[in-house]
């Protein structure tokens, strides 16, 4: 049992990943009375459990069955020869290519009565008349663009198009947009600006609301606010009086969302302007990246579950971040000319700060003292000239941290006795292949802003090689033909919104760059080629073993249209010549839980009857890849209806790469055998690994691991260390590390809520992490919930949750295995 003190900490600061209570913003955005919002203090009770619920999709095409009826896209006439296919720049091209290309995407499973009358892409100036000169109010026009549904049907606020049925790309050309009132987003909304000249949303001096943008869809709870994005814009409150309370953005959202390349411009010397909040409902977000904050009282005011903050800068902001949560990582951030960088008083689990700089700060980090393992702090390569860490108001550390500084429980291999450190320096011997200079390599999501329109190829517009993306036509052959013919180093393959049905492997050759309409461009597997569990077949195969070059994929979704026990969704073999040449950004996996997949309707009860996919992502031994903002989700609830979801996806993320692998802001949830598996892997850097165990596993489950999977791979755990009937031991591992070396894992968390979709008393699961036969393994900032053993070395228990009570259950500041 946890002590009352620990229980209070857990109650105060931990947020359930699928809590669905909606906290409305107060009704109409046109009523000033509705805009008074008070931040909630998120104190869920210890015994609270998520209550998954469906979202209505009342205008869905009920007859759409891609798993049954398919026609093959024809080749209508001779295609370009490969030597003629090299793309060239348009001599008269100017401006951002995304604004100029043909947008012929669709919502594939919308009722045909409405489908042709629904536009995914909306240019707020050309299509809705928004003023971008800064002279007239643009809020109403932008709001109309956000809200518009099919011209003959309901609008996007009507709660009638599910989660996946109402994708909307709201494009803002360059300019200044005067805002007299706020914008409200809905599920499936992505706001995109011109990265060559980012548009500015500038609040007027008489701005009426308390936020410029509300990202959270008010119809639903924060933890089911998926598929939202904002990128390439500036939000500006400098025209609002410094003495008026205003927040630029409410970002109370969860996984499969993206906030990147956004600037927050606020007046200096204000006590009331806040850049970003996440305080208006429970939320489970993964990553915020490549942002800047100028001025303001507070840059980000957070209450949530977990995050990694990557490449974020704060200049002249009084307090950079108020960080309320359990597992928080700062990576490559910069704080300058402020009073306090990170207020971690509310970080109940672990705060991990990596490759970060403070310049002209009063204090870089302030935290609370704790009598438990909670409030752990890890600093790794931090530069600061003044007070670096204050705990309980007292300066604990000043100046630079050249290596790694640990405050909290520290373990070494083969030793079940932790050291309680109040500030211990240890050595983390970083692999040079993972670095840019002294820092871990990172890069911003590519916008390809240097590309001309002539260098972008709409995959649906290639003469003679039709691709439909309509959720019913088999596009396999023609996608492969196009990717093969255009495998040059200069072409960008654009997949408009829609579902691309494939019946065999799509091969992505070296030289390929793919970009979709975020969360709306989906590749979906179906057919007998993916049915054999004993011989898994990749839906997407990126390069062959030994290939070296460029292969980049952004803004795509990968899924299955049927129960396919032999489907490995993505396999990567190619290695990058330079870091970032091979990568995935804002690309996600979804198994079940959505329109267009028979898994949604079939997999409602017994996991033995629903081996929906062999696994999600396999980074093979020859691969070298950079992955940022990726959620590997096997559905626990229905996004587009009310079907229960009891699905068995065999595996989450398997890493065997040895050259260099980066995983930044990733989540892997509800997969059967494991969420993350590092098998003979070397030279791996991670910043934030978030996971949940399948809700149907545990005491009372009809399937105890490795059941229902009969054909185990050599990399799979066999659970032979568990008694045959030990249901809590035979649950999915959060992380398995075997035969690996030089792994640098910052910020890992595993949350367990259920046994057999019902209540579990006390600990719900026995084991979280298993490490064996490895060297130079560094785990910093590890968090668990409702798990007995946090770390095993083979069969030996090293760290228990009871010994490391804090956060949402257990917290380990550092674990060094043979390091």
Give the ranges of each region predicted by the language model.
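Extracellular "leader-to-stem" segments immediately downstream of a signal peptide or signal-anchor
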Residues: 2-6, 11-169, 182, 196-240, ...
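Conserved SET/PR-domain catalytic core that frames the SAM/AdoMet-binding pocket
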Residues: 154, 167-176, 180-189, 490-512, ...
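Beta-solenoid repeat scaffold
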Residues: 175, 180-204, 228, 504-525
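Internal alpha-helical scaffold/solenoid segments in large eukaryotic proteins
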Residues: 181, 189, 295-297, 305-319, ...
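C-terminal, well-structured subdomains that either form a transmembrane helix-short loop-helix hairpin
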Residues: 481-486, 492-501, 505, 650-680, ...
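Active/binding-pocket-proximal capping segment
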Residues: 680-696, 701-708
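Long, ordered, helix-rich scaffold segments
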Residues: 749, 766-774, 778, 782-783, ...
């Amino acid at each position: 049992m946890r002590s009352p003190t620990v229980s209070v900490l857990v109650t105060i600061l931990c947020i359930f990943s699928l809590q669905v209570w909606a906290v409305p913003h107060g009704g109409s955005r046109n009523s000033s009375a509705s805009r008074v919002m008070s931040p909630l203090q998120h104190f869920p009770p210890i015994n609270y459990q998520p209550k998954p619920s469906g979202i209505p999709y009342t205008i869905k095409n009920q007859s759409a069955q891609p798993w049954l009826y398919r026609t093959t896209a024809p080749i209508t006439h001779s295609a370009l020869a490969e030597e003629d296919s090299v793309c060239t720049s348009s001599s008269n091209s100017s401006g951002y290519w995304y604004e100029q290309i043909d947008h012929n995407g669709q919502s594939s499973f919308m009722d045909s009565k409405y489908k042709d009358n629904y536009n995914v892409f909306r240019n707020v100036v050309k299509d809705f008349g928004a003023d971008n000169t800064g002279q007239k109010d643009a809020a109403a026009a932008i709001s109309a663009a956000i809200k518009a549904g099919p011209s003959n049907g309901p609008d996007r606020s009507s709660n009638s198009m599910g989660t996946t049925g109402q994708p909307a790309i709201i494009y803002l050309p360059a300019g200044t947009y005067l805002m007299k009132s706020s914008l409200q987003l809905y599920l499936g909304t992505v706001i995109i600006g011109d990265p060559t000249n980012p548009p500015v949303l500038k609040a007027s001096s008489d701005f009426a609301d308390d936020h410029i943008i509300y990202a959270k869809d008010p119809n639903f709870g924060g933890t089911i606010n998926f598929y939202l994005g904002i990128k390439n814009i500036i939000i500006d409150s400098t025209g609002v009086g410094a003495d008026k309370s205003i927040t630029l953005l409410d970002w109370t959202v969860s996984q499969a969302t993206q906030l990147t390349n956004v600037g927050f411009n606020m007046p200096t010397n204000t006590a009331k302007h806040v850049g970003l909040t996440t305080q208006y409902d429970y939320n489970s977000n993964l990553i915020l990246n490549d942002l800047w904050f100028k001025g303001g009282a507070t840059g980000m005011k957070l209450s949530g579950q977990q995050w990694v903050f990557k490449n974020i800068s704060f200049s002249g902001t009084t307090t950079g971040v108020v960080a309320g949560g359990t597992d928080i990582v700062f990576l490559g951030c910069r704080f300058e000319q402020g009073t306090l960088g990170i207020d971690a008083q509310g970080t109940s689990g672990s705060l991990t700060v990596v490759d970060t700089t403070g310049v002209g700060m009063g204090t870089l980090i302030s935290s609370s003292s704790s009598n438990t393992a909670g409030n752990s702090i890890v600093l790794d390569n931090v530069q600061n000239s003044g007070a670096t860490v204050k705990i309980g108001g007292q300066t604990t550390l000043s100046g630079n941290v050249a290596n790694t500084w640990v405050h909290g429980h520290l373990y070494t291999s083969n030793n079940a006795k932790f050291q309680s450190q109040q500030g211990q320096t240890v050595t983390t011997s970083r692999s040079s292949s993972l670095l840019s200079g002294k820092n871990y390599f990172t890069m911003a999501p590519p916008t390809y802003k240097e590309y001309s329109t002539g260098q972008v190829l709409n995959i649906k517009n290639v003469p003679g090689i039709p691709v439909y993306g309509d959720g019913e036509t088999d596009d396999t052959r023609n996608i492969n033909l196009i990717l093969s013919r255009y495998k040059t180093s200069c072409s960008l393959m654009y997949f408009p919104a829609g579902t691309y049905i494939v019946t065999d492997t799509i091969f992505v050759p070296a030289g390929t760059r793919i970009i979709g309409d975020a969360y709306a461009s989906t590749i979906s597997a179906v057919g007998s080629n993916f049915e054999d569990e004993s011989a898994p077949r990749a839906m997407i195969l990126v390069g062959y073993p030994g290939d070296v070059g460029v292969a980049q994929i952004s803004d795509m979704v990968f899924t299955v249209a049927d129960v396919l026990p032999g489907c490995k969704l993505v396999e990567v073999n190619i290695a990058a010549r330079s870091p970032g040449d091979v990568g995935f950004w804002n690309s996600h996996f979804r198994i079940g839980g959505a329109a267009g997949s028979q898994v949604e309707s079939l997999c409602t009860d017994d996991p033995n009857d629903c081996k929906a996919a062999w696994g999600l992502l396999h980074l093979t031994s020859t691969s070298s890849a950079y992955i940022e903002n990726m959620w590997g989700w096997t559905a626990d609830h229905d996004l587009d209806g009310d079907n229960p979801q009891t699905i068995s996806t065999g595996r989450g993320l398997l890493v065997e790469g040895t050259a260099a692998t980066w995983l930044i802001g990733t989540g892997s949830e509800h997969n059967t055998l494991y969420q993350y598996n590092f098998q003979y892997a070397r030279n791996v850097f991670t910043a934030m690994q978030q996971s949940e165990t399948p809700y149907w596993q545990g005491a009372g489950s009809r399937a105890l691991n490795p059941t229902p999977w009969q054909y185990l791979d050599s990399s799979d755990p066999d659970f032979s260390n568990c008694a045959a009937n030990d249901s809590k031991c035979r649950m999915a591992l959060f992380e398995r590390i075997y035969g690996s070396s030089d792994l640098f894992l910052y910020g890992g968390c595993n949350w367990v809520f259920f046994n057999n979709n019902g209540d579990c008393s006390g600990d719900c699961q026995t084991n979280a992490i298993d490490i064996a036969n490895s060297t130079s393994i560094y785990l910093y900032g590890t968090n668990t919930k409702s798990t007995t053993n946090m770390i095993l070395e083979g069969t030996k228990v090293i760290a228990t949750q009871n010994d490391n009570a804090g956060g949402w259950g257990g917290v380990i500041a550092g674990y060094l295995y043979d390091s």
